[in-house]
Amino acid sequence: MEIYKITTPGEWTYFAKGNANILFKYTGSNDYLRHKLLRVRLLKEDEQYISTCELYDFIELKCKPLFPHQIIDIQLVVLTTDFVNQLNNEGNKLMVKERYGLLLPNILDGDYCKQFLSRNCQLYIGTDTTVQEAGVNRNTVPEKLQGQEQKKLQKQEQFNNDIDSVIFEIKPKWLYDNISSNYCRTCSLNQLRGFQRHFCPLDLLYEETIDQGLDDILSLIPQDLLIEISETNKIPVKQLFRIFLNNPNNVFQKLKEYQRINNKNDLIKNITSIYDVSQNLSLVMTLRDVGLFIKFEKYNKYNNIHNSHNNINNLINIEGYGKFLLTCNIYDLDLKSKLKYKHWLDTEEKLQSIYNSSNPDWRHCVKVHDNTNNLGT
Protein backbone atom coordinates (compact mmCIF):
# COMPACT_ATOMS: atom_id res chain seq x y z
CA MET A 1 0.00 0.00 0.00
CA GLU A 2 1.25 3.46 -0.92
CA ILE A 3 0.36 5.11 2.35
CA TYR A 4 1.29 8.61 1.25
CA LYS A 5 -1.68 8.53 -1.15
CA ILE A 6 -4.30 8.21 1.61
CA THR A 7 -2.76 10.26 4.43
CA THR A 8 -0.43 13.17 5.12
CA PRO A 9 2.55 13.40 7.52
CA GLY A 10 0.60 15.93 9.60
CA GLU A 11 -1.90 13.24 10.57
CA TRP A 12 0.81 11.27 12.38
CA THR A 13 2.16 12.26 15.79
CA TYR A 14 5.19 10.93 17.64
CA PHE A 15 4.25 7.98 19.85
CA ALA A 16 7.41 6.17 21.01
CA LYS A 17 10.82 4.96 19.90
CA GLY A 18 13.27 2.15 20.50
CA ASN A 19 16.85 1.53 19.46
CA ALA A 20 16.06 0.89 15.80
CA ASN A 21 12.58 2.23 15.12
CA ILE A 22 10.28 5.14 15.81
CA LEU A 23 6.47 4.90 16.05
CA PHE A 24 3.91 7.46 14.92
CA LYS A 25 0.24 7.42 15.96
CA TYR A 26 -2.49 8.17 13.45
CA THR A 27 -4.74 11.11 14.38
CA GLY A 28 -6.70 11.63 11.16
CA SER A 29 -10.18 10.57 10.07
CA ASN A 30 -9.41 7.66 7.73
CA ASP A 31 -11.26 4.67 9.21
CA TYR A 32 -8.72 2.19 7.87
CA LEU A 33 -5.80 3.95 9.56
CA ARG A 34 -7.58 4.74 12.82
CA HIS A 35 -6.10 2.87 15.81
CA LYS A 36 -2.90 2.23 13.82
CA LEU A 37 0.79 3.00 14.29
CA LEU A 38 3.38 3.65 11.59
CA ARG A 39 6.82 2.22 12.28
CA VAL A 40 9.72 3.98 10.56
CA ARG A 41 13.40 3.08 10.80
CA LEU A 42 15.87 5.25 12.68
CA LEU A 43 19.14 6.22 11.03
CA LYS A 44 21.73 3.43 11.14
CA GLU A 45 25.12 2.89 9.58
CA ASP A 46 24.76 1.11 6.25
CA GLU A 47 26.78 -1.93 7.30
CA GLN A 48 24.49 -2.52 10.30
CA TYR A 49 21.24 -1.66 8.55
CA ILE A 50 18.59 -4.29 7.91
CA SER A 51 15.98 -3.12 5.42
CA THR A 52 12.30 -3.00 6.30
CA CYS A 53 11.53 -5.52 3.53
CA GLU A 54 14.04 -7.97 4.97
CA LEU A 55 12.61 -7.41 8.44
CA TYR A 56 9.05 -7.92 7.18
CA ASP A 57 9.99 -11.23 5.51
CA PHE A 58 11.81 -12.33 8.66
CA ILE A 59 8.72 -11.71 10.82
CA GLU A 60 6.25 -13.28 8.39
CA LEU A 61 8.33 -16.31 7.38
CA LYS A 62 10.45 -17.09 10.46
CA CYS A 63 8.59 -15.72 13.48
CA LYS A 64 4.87 -15.95 12.75
CA PRO A 65 4.91 -19.73 12.20
CA LEU A 66 6.25 -20.05 15.76
CA PHE A 67 3.69 -17.68 17.30
CA PRO A 68 0.71 -17.56 14.89
CA HIS A 69 -1.70 -16.15 17.47
CA GLN A 70 0.55 -13.79 19.42
CA ILE A 71 2.50 -11.78 16.85
CA ILE A 72 0.57 -8.67 15.91
CA ASP A 73 -0.47 -8.25 12.28
CA ILE A 74 1.78 -5.95 10.29
CA GLN A 75 1.47 -4.48 6.81
CA LEU A 76 4.28 -3.34 4.55
CA VAL A 77 3.61 0.19 3.26
CA VAL A 78 5.40 2.32 0.68
CA LEU A 79 6.91 5.62 1.85
CA THR A 80 8.50 8.55 0.05
CA THR A 81 11.46 10.64 1.15
CA ASP A 82 9.23 13.73 1.35
CA PHE A 83 6.68 11.91 3.52
CA VAL A 84 9.35 10.72 5.98
CA ASN A 85 11.05 14.13 6.09
CA GLN A 86 7.78 15.83 7.04
CA LEU A 87 6.98 13.52 9.96
CA ASN A 88 7.26 15.12 13.41
CA ASN A 89 10.31 13.10 14.45
CA GLU A 90 10.91 14.86 17.79
CA GLY A 91 14.53 15.49 16.82
CA ASN A 92 15.30 11.87 15.94
CA LYS A 93 17.17 11.13 12.72
CA LEU A 94 15.22 8.86 10.38
CA MET A 95 16.40 6.57 7.60
CA VAL A 96 14.96 8.81 4.88
CA LYS A 97 16.16 6.63 2.01
CA GLU A 98 14.17 3.65 3.32
CA ARG A 99 11.23 3.20 0.93
CA TYR A 100 9.08 1.09 3.24
CA GLY A 101 7.48 1.29 6.66
CA LEU A 102 5.31 -1.02 8.74
CA LEU A 103 1.69 -0.39 9.67
CA LEU A 104 0.56 -2.11 12.86
CA PRO A 105 -2.30 -1.97 15.38
CA ASN A 106 -1.94 0.24 18.44
CA ILE A 107 -2.30 -2.15 21.39
CA LEU A 108 -2.45 0.85 23.74
CA ASP A 109 -5.16 2.64 21.80
CA GLY A 110 -7.68 4.17 24.19
CA ASP A 111 -7.47 5.75 27.61
CA TYR A 112 -4.51 4.21 29.41
CA CYS A 113 -2.45 5.50 32.31
CA LYS A 114 1.15 4.32 32.34
CA GLN A 115 2.75 3.26 35.61
CA PHE A 116 6.52 2.81 35.28
CA LEU A 117 7.68 -0.21 37.27
CA SER A 118 11.15 -1.08 35.97
CA ARG A 119 13.20 -1.16 32.79
CA ASN A 120 11.66 -4.42 31.62
CA CYS A 121 8.15 -4.01 33.02
CA GLN A 122 5.47 -1.34 32.65
CA LEU A 123 1.84 -1.28 33.74
CA TYR A 124 -1.03 0.34 31.84
CA ILE A 125 -4.42 0.89 33.46
CA GLY A 126 -7.40 1.34 31.16
CA THR A 127 -10.70 3.02 32.04
CA ASP A 128 -13.96 2.93 30.17
CA THR A 129 -14.27 6.72 29.89
CA THR A 130 -11.87 9.63 29.66
CA VAL A 131 -10.64 11.01 32.95
CA GLN A 132 -9.94 14.72 32.86
CA GLU A 133 -6.81 15.77 34.69
CA ALA A 134 -5.47 19.22 35.38
CA GLY A 135 -2.30 19.53 33.32
CA VAL A 136 -1.61 15.79 33.21
CA ASN A 137 -1.74 13.59 30.11
CA ARG A 138 -2.96 10.15 31.19
CA ASN A 139 -0.89 8.41 28.56
CA THR A 140 2.40 9.89 29.72
CA VAL A 141 2.69 9.86 33.49
CA PRO A 142 6.27 11.10 34.07
CA GLU A 143 8.60 8.26 35.02
CA LYS A 144 10.63 10.63 37.18
CA LEU A 145 7.74 10.89 39.63
CA GLN A 146 8.48 8.39 42.34
CA GLY A 147 7.68 7.65 45.97
CA GLN A 148 5.46 10.07 47.82
CA GLU A 149 5.25 12.55 44.95
CA GLN A 150 3.90 9.89 42.65
CA LYS A 151 1.41 8.62 45.22
CA LYS A 152 0.22 12.17 45.77
CA LEU A 153 -0.30 12.62 42.05
CA GLN A 154 -2.20 9.35 41.85
CA LYS A 155 -4.53 10.37 44.63
CA GLN A 156 -5.18 13.70 42.95
CA GLU A 157 -6.08 11.96 39.69
CA GLN A 158 -7.82 9.02 41.40
CA PHE A 159 -9.79 6.83 39.03
CA ASN A 160 -13.29 8.29 39.11
CA ASN A 161 -14.28 5.86 36.36
CA ASP A 162 -14.27 2.09 36.33
CA ILE A 163 -11.02 0.37 35.44
CA ASP A 164 -11.87 -2.23 32.82
CA SER A 165 -8.46 -3.46 31.66
CA VAL A 166 -4.89 -3.88 32.82
CA ILE A 167 -1.92 -4.38 30.51
CA PHE A 168 1.56 -5.51 31.53
CA GLU A 169 4.32 -4.68 29.06
CA ILE A 170 7.16 -7.08 29.79
CA LYS A 171 10.49 -7.89 28.18
CA PRO A 172 11.15 -11.47 29.33
CA LYS A 173 14.65 -11.47 27.80
CA TRP A 174 16.60 -14.77 28.11
CA LEU A 175 14.45 -17.75 29.15
CA TYR A 176 16.16 -21.07 29.83
CA ASP A 177 16.79 -23.67 32.53
CA ASN A 178 19.46 -22.26 34.82
CA ILE A 179 21.54 -25.25 35.87
CA SER A 180 24.29 -23.90 38.08
CA SER A 181 24.66 -20.09 38.14
CA ASN A 182 23.65 -17.97 41.11
CA TYR A 183 22.18 -15.44 38.70
CA CYS A 184 20.55 -15.92 35.33
CA ARG A 185 21.72 -14.01 32.30
CA THR A 186 19.01 -11.32 32.61
CA CYS A 187 19.55 -10.69 36.32
CA SER A 188 23.32 -10.63 35.78
CA LEU A 189 22.99 -8.04 33.01
CA ASN A 190 20.66 -5.89 35.13
CA GLN A 191 23.25 -5.91 37.92
CA LEU A 192 26.00 -5.02 35.46
CA ARG A 193 23.93 -2.02 34.36
CA GLY A 194 23.33 -0.91 37.93
CA PHE A 195 19.57 -1.51 38.03
CA GLN A 196 17.64 -2.41 41.15
CA ARG A 197 16.07 -5.86 41.31
CA HIS A 198 12.44 -6.14 40.27
CA PHE A 199 11.70 -9.71 39.20
CA CYS A 200 13.50 -12.69 37.66
CA PRO A 201 11.86 -13.88 34.42
CA LEU A 202 12.86 -17.48 35.18
CA ASP A 203 10.46 -17.47 38.15
CA LEU A 204 7.58 -17.23 35.68
CA LEU A 205 8.51 -20.60 34.14
CA TYR A 206 8.04 -23.00 37.05
CA GLU A 207 5.02 -23.88 39.16
CA GLU A 208 6.97 -23.65 42.40
CA THR A 209 8.26 -20.12 41.68
CA ILE A 210 5.35 -18.47 39.83
CA ASP A 211 3.89 -16.93 42.98
CA GLN A 212 7.26 -15.48 43.96
CA GLY A 213 7.70 -14.02 40.49
CA LEU A 214 4.23 -12.48 40.50
CA ASP A 215 4.70 -11.05 43.99
CA ASP A 216 7.92 -9.41 42.78
CA ILE A 217 6.22 -7.94 39.70
CA LEU A 218 3.30 -6.57 41.72
CA SER A 219 5.53 -5.28 44.54
CA LEU A 220 6.39 -2.08 42.68
CA ILE A 221 2.77 -1.14 42.04
CA PRO A 222 1.73 1.45 44.67
CA GLN A 223 -0.45 -0.33 47.22
CA ASP A 224 -3.39 2.06 46.87
CA LEU A 225 -3.38 1.56 43.10
CA LEU A 226 -3.23 -2.22 43.45
CA ILE A 227 -6.21 -2.10 45.83
CA GLU A 228 -8.04 0.15 43.37
CA ILE A 229 -7.51 -2.42 40.62
CA SER A 230 -8.00 -5.69 42.50
CA GLU A 231 -10.56 -4.81 45.15
CA THR A 232 -12.47 -1.68 44.13
CA ASN A 233 -12.69 -2.62 40.46
CA LYS A 234 -12.54 -6.38 41.01
CA ILE A 235 -9.78 -7.28 38.56
CA PRO A 236 -7.85 -10.00 40.46
CA VAL A 237 -4.55 -9.31 38.74
CA LYS A 238 -2.41 -11.93 40.47
CA GLN A 239 -5.02 -14.65 40.03
CA LEU A 240 -5.45 -13.82 36.34
CA PHE A 241 -1.69 -13.71 35.78
CA ARG A 242 -1.28 -17.07 37.52
CA ILE A 243 -3.97 -18.63 35.31
CA PHE A 244 -2.14 -17.27 32.28
CA LEU A 245 1.20 -18.73 33.42
CA ASN A 246 -0.29 -22.09 34.44
CA ASN A 247 -1.16 -22.75 30.81
CA PRO A 248 1.67 -25.06 29.64
CA ASN A 249 1.58 -23.40 26.20
CA ASN A 250 1.84 -19.82 27.45
CA VAL A 251 4.14 -17.42 25.63
CA PHE A 252 6.94 -17.62 28.22
CA GLN A 253 7.18 -21.39 27.77
CA LYS A 254 7.10 -21.02 24.00
CA LEU A 255 9.83 -18.37 24.04
CA LYS A 256 11.95 -20.62 26.24
CA GLU A 257 11.47 -23.48 23.78
CA TYR A 258 12.43 -21.46 20.71
CA GLN A 259 15.32 -19.67 22.41
CA ARG A 260 16.98 -22.99 23.12
CA ILE A 261 20.42 -23.53 21.60
CA ASN A 262 20.70 -27.03 20.10
CA ASN A 263 23.98 -26.64 18.24
CA LYS A 264 27.19 -25.86 20.11
CA ASN A 265 28.31 -23.72 17.17
CA ASP A 266 25.49 -21.31 18.05
CA LEU A 267 26.80 -20.70 21.55
CA ILE A 268 27.97 -17.10 21.79
CA LYS A 269 31.26 -18.14 23.34
CA ASN A 270 32.06 -20.11 20.16
CA ILE A 271 31.53 -17.25 17.71
CA THR A 272 34.66 -15.75 16.16
CA SER A 273 33.29 -13.83 13.15
CA ILE A 274 30.08 -12.78 11.39
CA TYR A 275 30.31 -16.00 9.39
CA ASP A 276 29.69 -17.98 12.58
CA VAL A 277 26.34 -16.26 13.17
CA SER A 278 23.78 -18.69 11.78
CA GLN A 279 20.19 -17.88 10.81
CA ASN A 280 19.07 -19.86 13.83
CA LEU A 281 21.22 -17.79 16.20
CA SER A 282 19.87 -14.57 14.65
CA LEU A 283 16.35 -15.83 15.34
CA VAL A 284 17.23 -16.86 18.90
CA MET A 285 18.80 -13.47 19.66
CA THR A 286 15.71 -11.73 18.28
CA LEU A 287 13.44 -13.82 20.52
CA ARG A 288 15.64 -12.94 23.49
CA ASP A 289 14.78 -9.27 23.02
CA VAL A 290 11.06 -9.26 22.23
CA GLY A 291 8.41 -7.40 24.18
CA LEU A 292 5.04 -8.69 25.37
CA PHE A 293 1.70 -7.00 25.99
CA ILE A 294 -0.29 -9.18 28.40
CA LYS A 295 -3.83 -7.85 28.76
CA PHE A 296 -6.43 -8.71 31.40
CA GLU A 297 -9.78 -7.20 30.44
CA LYS A 298 -13.28 -7.37 31.87
CA TYR A 299 -15.54 -9.22 29.48
CA ASN A 300 -18.05 -7.05 27.63
CA LYS A 301 -20.85 -8.98 25.93
CA TYR A 302 -21.42 -6.05 23.58
CA ASN A 303 -17.80 -6.04 22.38
CA ASN A 304 -17.48 -7.89 19.06
CA ILE A 305 -13.79 -8.59 19.67
CA HIS A 306 -14.57 -10.26 22.99
CA ASN A 307 -17.14 -12.47 21.27
CA SER A 308 -15.00 -13.34 18.26
CA HIS A 309 -14.13 -16.94 17.43
CA ASN A 310 -10.43 -16.17 17.96
CA ASN A 311 -11.04 -15.39 21.63
CA ILE A 312 -13.14 -18.42 22.58
CA ASN A 313 -10.21 -19.99 24.42
CA ASN A 314 -9.10 -16.70 25.97
CA LEU A 315 -12.18 -16.19 28.16
CA ILE A 316 -11.79 -17.00 31.85
CA ASN A 317 -14.54 -17.04 34.48
CA ILE A 318 -13.46 -16.41 38.08
CA GLU A 319 -15.98 -17.02 40.83
CA GLY A 320 -16.85 -13.83 42.66
CA TYR A 321 -15.30 -11.62 39.98
CA GLY A 322 -16.92 -12.54 36.67
CA LYS A 323 -15.59 -13.19 33.19
CA PHE A 324 -12.33 -11.85 31.76
CA LEU A 325 -10.54 -11.85 28.42
CA LEU A 326 -6.82 -12.75 28.60
CA THR A 327 -4.73 -11.91 25.54
CA CYS A 328 -1.04 -11.65 24.73
CA ASN A 329 0.77 -9.97 21.86
CA ILE A 330 4.44 -10.10 20.87
CA TYR A 331 6.18 -7.05 19.46
CA ASP A 332 9.70 -5.77 18.80
CA LEU A 333 10.76 -8.62 16.53
CA ASP A 334 13.86 -6.91 15.21
CA LEU A 335 16.24 -9.10 13.25
CA LYS A 336 19.70 -8.67 14.76
CA SER A 337 22.62 -7.69 12.57
CA LYS A 338 25.38 -10.30 12.45
CA LEU A 339 27.81 -7.52 13.32
CA LYS A 340 26.35 -7.49 16.83
CA TYR A 341 28.32 -10.65 17.61
CA LYS A 342 31.15 -8.46 18.95
CA HIS A 343 28.74 -6.80 21.36
CA TRP A 344 27.38 -10.19 22.45
CA LEU A 345 30.89 -11.49 23.14
CA ASP A 346 31.89 -8.35 25.02
CA THR A 347 28.78 -8.52 27.19
CA GLU A 348 29.31 -12.18 28.03
CA GLU A 349 32.88 -11.46 29.09
CA LYS A 350 31.68 -8.74 31.46
CA LEU A 351 29.03 -11.02 32.95
CA GLN A 352 31.41 -13.81 33.91
CA SER A 353 32.23 -12.24 37.28
CA ILE A 354 28.54 -11.77 38.12
CA TYR A 355 26.98 -15.14 37.27
CA ASN A 356 28.22 -16.83 40.45
CA SER A 357 28.61 -13.81 42.70
CA SER A 358 26.48 -13.01 45.75
CA ASN A 359 24.72 -9.67 45.99
CA PRO A 360 22.96 -9.07 49.34
CA ASP A 361 20.39 -6.91 47.52
CA TRP A 362 19.69 -9.50 44.82
CA ARG A 363 18.19 -12.90 45.59
CA HIS A 364 19.74 -15.85 43.77
CA CYS A 365 17.84 -17.12 40.74
CA VAL A 366 16.06 -20.45 40.59
CA LYS A 367 18.15 -23.47 39.60
CA VAL A 368 16.69 -26.58 38.01
CA HIS A 369 17.95 -30.10 37.43
CA ASP A 370 18.45 -30.70 33.72
CA ASN A 371 18.08 -34.05 31.97
CA THR A 372 18.01 -32.82 28.38
CA ASN A 373 21.68 -32.28 27.51
CA ASN A 374 21.14 -28.55 27.56
CA LEU A 375 24.04 -26.84 25.80
CA GLY A 376 23.54 -23.60 27.71
CA THR A 377 23.14 -20.05 26.44
UniProtKB/Swiss-Prot annotation:
One of its GO terms (cellular component) is nucleus. The keyword Nucleus applies. Its main location: nucleus. GO terms for molecular function: ATP binding; inositol-1,3,4,5,6-pentakisphosphate 2-kinase activity. Transmembrane segments: none annotated. Keywords: ATP-binding, Kinase, Nucleotide-binding, Nucleus, Transferase. InterPro entries: Ins_P5_2-kin, IP5_2-K_N_lobe. It is found in: Nucleus. It comes from Debaryomyces hansenii (strain ATCC 36239 / CBS 767 / BCRC 21394 / JCM 1990 / NBRC 0083 / IGC 2968) (Yeast). The EXKPK motif is conserved in inositol-pentakisphosphate 2-kinases of both family 1 and 2. Has kinase activity and phosphorylates inositol-1,3,4,5,6-pentakisphosphate (Ins(1,3,4,5,6)P5) to produce 1,2,3,4,5,6-hexakisphosphate (InsP6), also known as phytate. A motif (EXKPK motif) lies at residues 169-173. It comes from the Eukaryota. It catalyses: 1D-myo-inositol 1,3,4,5,6-pentakisphosphate + ATP = 1D-myo-inositol hexakisphosphate + ADP + H(+). One of its GO terms (biological process) is inositol phosphate biosynthetic process. This is Inositol-pentakisphosphate 2-kinase. The keyword tRNA-binding does not apply. Its EC number is 2.7.1.158. Belongs to the IPK1 type 1 family.
